[in-house]
Amino acid sequence: MKNTTNVKTVNKELSINELKIGRCYRAKKPRPAGQFASYANDRQIMRIGSTTVQYDGPSVHARRHYPTISKEKFLAWASHDVTDELPPGEWQIWPIPKS
């Protein structure tokens, strides 16, 4: 008889050491963002300080300063690194296509 026990897959949480400048991260609960077109509200890390992360993304309006938040808040927001999934030099169009 086949074992049909349900096994939950647990997503690995990001750690502070995994955050890298220039990489893009997706939200745990993605939302649409952008001024003229809808994109996923991904964030690209521009700078990492001792306790803060400065980022860019479709939700950051043109000619505005890059927002800075604590590393803990960024990690609470971020689900995973999506840099390799994105078209080169572009943001992910909303809605996100199902794989």
Residue spans of the language-model regions?
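Intrinsically disordered, low-complexity, charged/polar segments
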Residues: 4, 59-99
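Basic/aromatic-rich interaction segments and small domains that mediate binding to polyanionic partners
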Residues: 37-66
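Generic alpha-helical hydrophobic packing signal
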Residues: 16, 21, 45-49, 65-72
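Short, charged low-complexity linear motifs
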Residues: 9-13, 41-42, 76-79
